[in-house]
Amino acid sequence: MALSHARKYRYIETNAAKDTLTKFGKSDKTPDPYTPEQVKALMQRVEGTVWEMPVILGGLYGMRRSEILGLRWRNVDLENNTFDVSEQLPFKVPPKTKVIEEMAPPKSNGRTLPITELAHPFFLKQFAMQEAQREQAEKDGKPYYDNDLVVAKPDGSPISASWVSSQFGKLLEDLDMPHIRFHDLRHTAATNMHQLTGDFYTVGEVLGHTLAGIGVSLGLSMNFEAVTARYVDVRLERKKEVLDAYHGAVKQADPAKAKEAEPKKAKSAAKKKSSEIEL
């Protein structure tokens, strides 16, 4: 009953107790996560588009879609280079919503994450871009809906989570990148951080994942209760070390070595690219 009420009022996206289908549908197969080379290639190809910040937060930090769309500037500390994941966009916000009155709590406990050397310029760029959009709206006499969102439409209103999911695959197709779902950026971040550091506990803390959950995600099996007892606290600096290892690998990666996408059927030249589709 409690889960049903939480689902009804959009505090959670699904009622896990009622879900009987596998997470990945009929094939029950997760697409291969992107390599650091592919992550860098994707970052370069979405530079300057509405996808830039979602890819940074999803691909480098493994944030959930609703956490990305619900991140607000009040929870970003650019002076101390940290940000708090303490809320998320409510589930199924109507497409034409302009103002978010109240955010939903995150799926897991809130967490503080470091803004790395690689990520910092993207936060600054995003902030400056939104300031310019706000000023332009004032000059044009158009409304600007200041929801304080890090990721938003040009008029400040929230981006629909369903739009992100439905258009991400089309974006990758347009960019000649291997197909993954947007949520697989989270799996990409988890896999790369773990492969580079072996520290699955801290990886779980970065992702806001339960210890058992991150173990399942990475295909690990052990006594998680015993591990939890030994590692009851992960300092921010350790999170930074793990993130720096991954972000450093992405920074040094050669995007030319990224795996080529599979050949695709020819598309109509008149068809709009997903990156050009209006939000």
Predicted regions and their residues:
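Basic, Lys/Arg- and aromatic-enriched nucleic-acid-binding interface segment
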Residues: 8, 12-71, 79, 110, ...
